[in-house]
Amino acid sequence: MSEVASWQPDVLGPGYEMMTLALGTDYEGEVTATLVRRRPADPKGRRAVLYVHGYNDYFFQEHVADFYAGLGVSFYALDLRKHGRSLLPHQTAYLCLSLREYFPEIDAAVAMIRRDGHELVLVSGHSTGGLVVSLWAAEGGNRGLVDALILNSPYLSSGVPLAVRLAVDPVCRVLVRRNPAAAFPLRLSPRYARSLHRCYEGEWDFNTAWKSVRGTRLRMAWLASIHAGQRRVREGLGITAPVLVLCGTASGNRKTPAPELFAVDIVLDVAQIAQLSPSLGRDVTCTRIAGAIHDVFLSRPAVRQQAFDELADWLTAHDLVSEIRQKPCRSGD
């Protein structure tokens, strides 16, 4: 990776800064990622967390940053290449040929966090980001770089039967060799994103150019890379750091009606997340939150507060935050 730029104001406004991470070139040309940080009240704090988003996603969850600040943990977030702040005009959104493509920006982000003076680094990943950071943490050279993993509904399984995967994956690989950007004819349903945005059914405001509410094209190369990563999870990753997995207790689908829609995961099968969690490492806690949606920290207020409380208790029990801590802020307080 070439030399990184300096910290600049971020689109989230006062209190947030961003840094562009130059990552060279790939099969589409220039590649960058974006590191965002919440300016800490205590710049000498030794603990920090790095948050990595999911598919069709970017960092906008300021209330999550506020939660960690309340625990005395400096907050950083990474917009991966070809996502959100990092998407360049010549790039195909979300395209990757292997999930290992994301490892350089995670390496660079952790190095910058260490350079900022933080000795203890937590890494948190949501959905696809949860799968990516798990694979990254399992790499031999990375096992000493992370002190704990916090996974928010990690994409450990596609919910696709084995027979279907065995039939589809070879076809995908052939088509990808011919055209890396080959896409499936159907678009990903926009129902989940619309259930979050305040202009539709939700309470959150986010940039719909970076988190689409119109459905997205699923690339065959991306799906093949996801399935390859999930195979590694099933084989066992052997992560040595403690891992917390948070997910809901019930799943639905894009046809699930309101108000049930706001109390279930309509993206992933939470039972499979819970079933596969022990494959991540030797010290894994899976906590299921009743009423949680796919991103548990975007659930209804009482549910997400329970998730925050469970996370704070786990961090304290593992001596990852100070025992004396400020009560984390609720969104909207």
Model-derived features with residue positions:
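N-terminal cap/lid segment of alpha/beta-hydrolase-fold proteins
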Residues: M1-D42
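Short beta-strand element of the alpha/beta-hydrolase
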Residues: R46-G54
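Catalytic nucleophile-loop/oxyanion-hole region of alpha/beta-hydrolase
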Residues: N56, G84-L120, V303-A307
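Conserved alpha/beta-hydrolase
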Residues: D57-A65, A69-H90
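Alpha/beta-hydrolase-fold enzymes
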Residues: T128, V132-L218
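Serine-hydrolase catalytic core
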Residues: A183-R288
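Catalytic active-site module of serine/aspartate enzymes centered on a nucleophile-bearing elbow/loop
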Residues: D283-D333
